[in-house]
Amino acid sequence: CPYYMTYSGCCAGNSDGWKDNLKPEYYEEFAHYLVDVCKHYKDEYGIEFRTLEPFNEPLTNYWSRNGGQEGCHFDISSQIAFLKVLSPILKESGLNTVISASDESVLSDSYNTFEGYRSAGVLNLIGQWNTHSYYGNNKDRSKIRTLSQESGLRLWMSETGSGGSGISGNLEMAKRLMNDVNYL
């Protein structure tokens, strides 16, 4: 999110990576900002995005002030609150784009976030469940697949990596991809 919407004044994250950085009073403005970007691409280039993902690895502590990459921690309750603001704005935009969430880096976090959304009754606000598969096991993958199937949401593995190089890194990447295909 733009720096002026944050607690820290920095788009790389809060001073404490475990704390939210987007101020709630900017939820509506940030939601309009995201939807305006989608509308711009449709109007200027004829590209309509299938999904809009407002979060990236939101439960992690990677995102800290003056870090090397922009990012923003969102507790599950903050994600839910933001989705409640974003959803009607996106629907009113006239776009066919749906919200995807929540791109957690850890499969168990993805599962817990999904359960949090379900408990809060907000799964109907999203059209696709995104997850990363950097960390976790096949049991976690299967749990996410089952939740997605039960809810009728499209499931999308949107990012992974092996963290290695050479043949060992390549073999690990192949293993992860095969596990994602077979268990997600």
Q: What do the PLM-derived regions correspond to, one by one?
A:
Residues 33, 82, 110-113, 125, ...:
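General structural feature for long, well-ordered alpha-helical segments within catalytic domains
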Residues 1-118:
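Substrate-binding cleft and catalytic face of glycoside hydrolase catalytic domains
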